[in-house]
């Protein structure tokens, strides 16, 4: 029993880390419709990403993203922040929240939609879910490694 308590305490005390398991290019296809998301490997406390969607050879939408690790012990500063800018506009910050679910979750309850962004892996696939902060109005994408 004591070992379980020690293991739980150690897990809770682990420092936040950038989600290196997201690095790479990911793609989802359904007929002519496609969506892709690419993330750099962590470097210098940051991951840089982009997403784009389209049909055939036409681009429908795009977004630039960033995940930043703050090098601070100040509890007033979010240790990890996700930034998204659909179409390169209105860059919005989402704060990392510690959850028991696998993956990484970011929340900004003051944003219209999405308010919650969650990434996790299932086998080789990268799963992304966006929703309101209570989990309602969820949309989900399942990406496979691009080129496979």
Predicted regions and their residues:
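N-terminal helix-cap/turn-to-beta initiation motif at the start of protein domains
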Residues: 11-25
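Short cationic/low-complexity microdomains
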Residues: 105-125
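Sec-dependent N-terminal signal peptides
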Residues: 2-10
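Central antiparallel beta-sheet cores of small beta-barrel/beta-sandwich binding domains
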Residues: 23, 28-110
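Edge beta-strand at a domain terminus
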Residues: 91, 101, 120-127, 131-148
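Short beta-strand segments and strand-loop junctions that repeat across beta-rich extracellular domains
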Residues: 18-22, 30, 131-133
């Amino acid at each position: 029993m004591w070992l379980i308590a020690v293991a739980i305490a150690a897990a809770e005390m682990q420092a936040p880390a950038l989600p290196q398991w997201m690095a790479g290019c990911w793609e989802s296809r359904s007929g002519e419709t496609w969506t892709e998301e690419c993330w750099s490997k962590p470097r210098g406390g940051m991951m840089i990403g982009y997403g784009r969607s389209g049909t055939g050879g036409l681009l429908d939408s795009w977004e630039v993203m960033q995940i930043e690790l703050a090098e601070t012990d100040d509890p007033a500063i979010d240790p990890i922040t996700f930034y998204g800018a659909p179409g390169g506009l209105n860059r919005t910050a989402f704060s990392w929240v510690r959850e028991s679910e696998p993956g990484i979750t970011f929340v900004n309850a003051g944003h219209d939609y999405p308010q919650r962004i969650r990434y996790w892996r299932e086998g080789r696939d990268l799963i992304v879910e966006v929703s309101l902060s209570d989990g309602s109005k969820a949309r989900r994408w399942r990406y496979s490694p691009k080129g496979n």
